[in-house]
Amino acid sequence: MTLKDIVVGFGTTVRSIWLIGMNAFAKRETLMYPEEPVYLPPRYRGRIVLTRDPDGQERCVACNLCAVACPVGCISLQKAETADGRWYPEFFRINFSRCIFCGLCEEACPTTAIQLTPDFELGEFKRQDLVYEKENLLISGPGKYPEYNFYRMAGMAIDGKDKGDAENEAKPIDVKGLLP
């Protein structure tokens, strides 16, 4: 060991002590998470929820577009139909242990039934607890779009109304009557 090695070792030790002393009283960058809230950007994509119409019925029409758009295949559902012809999912299942929270399911949904919330705390001890069924995903409100009702906008016959009686819907045209 030479004198040069001793001087370099002593210098690095003094420099390390100096840097620790300078930063010991600086503002801390680490957040104490449960006590301090985490900043989430306005468009943060978190847990998926299923919303309802302003009438209180499920918005999901089981079109299966969300399952097709999902790049990891974590959404599965089965379509069923009511007596009045309205489609609904018999079961709707999302496996959050596979979900990458990309938001493609929300973009693909024509009825705005699927919406992403800023909730990100999905820690569980068992993987089975990360598989959410329709009952776990349904919320009582309309979510981000409180006035949107797919069946009124789409022109499907609503109980008690004929086609063309809904809002923003033109009366049907008799195409056969236009023939010469």
UniProtKB/Swiss-Prot annotation:
Transmembrane segments: none
UniProt superkingdom: Bacteria
Listed GO biological process terms: aerobic respiration
Stretches assigned to the 4Fe-4S ferredoxin-type domain: 48-80, 90-119
Residues annotated as binding [4Fe-4S] cluster 2: C70, C99, C102, C105
GO MF, one example: quinone binding
Positions annotated to bind [4Fe-4S] cluster 1: C60, C63, C66, C109
Reactions listed under catalytic activity: a quinone + NADH + 5 H(+)(in) = a quinol + NAD(+) + 4 H(+)(out)
Major site of localization recorded for this protein: membrane
Cofactor note: Binds 2 [4Fe-4S] clusters per subunit.
UniProt xrefs under Gene3D superfamilies: 3.30.70.3270
Membrane topology: Peripheral membrane protein
Chain's role: NDH-1 shuttles electrons from NADH, via FMN and iron-sulfur (Fe-S) centers, to quinones in the respiratory chain. The immediate electron acceptor for the enzyme in this species is believed to be ubiquinone. Couples the redox reaction to proton translocation (for every two electrons transferred, four hydrogen ions are translocated across the cytoplasmic membrane), and thus conserves the redox energy in a proton gradient.
Subunit structure as annotated in this protein's UniProt entry: NDH-1 is composed of 13 different subunits. Subunits NuoA, H, J, K, L, M, N constitute the membrane sector of the complex.
Family: Belongs to the complex I 23 kDa subunit family.
HAMAP family recorded: NDH1_NuoI
Name of the featured protein: NADH-quinone oxidoreductase subunit I
